[in-house]
Amino acid sequence: MPVHLFDIIPDARRSMLRITMRGHWITETVEEYRVAVARAVATLIENGCKRERIVALVDAREVSAQSQDVIEEYQKNMVRDGRVPRRLATLLSSALFKRQVERIAMPNQRIFSHEHEALAWLLSSDDDA
């Protein structure tokens, strides 16, 4: 049975994307992910969410350290599409992967070990990212 390398669940009530990443990606996975994120954002907007208010919770605790090609493709896609959420909380457990994420982190991104802390930051009314 193939492993699903990511799941994306739009939560219109919170203007939030809940994303789970797992495993080792290839550059084609990054493109599949980009398309899935675009669909999920469109779903939120269709349900009344404003693009500039969308936040994202990315659970990357089950993802492996990625190749440089995958990291570069991921970063390029995020910048190219302009689909940067208002806030991006990333859940990590691996110190090695944390260093990779920190290298490509966006200004509005924070890294967390605990989901409750990530959600509190994402959903706070404070507009400072």
List each language-model region with its residue ranges.
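Amphipathic, Lys/Arg-enriched alpha-helical "gate/interface" segment within cytosolic domains
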Residues: M1-A129
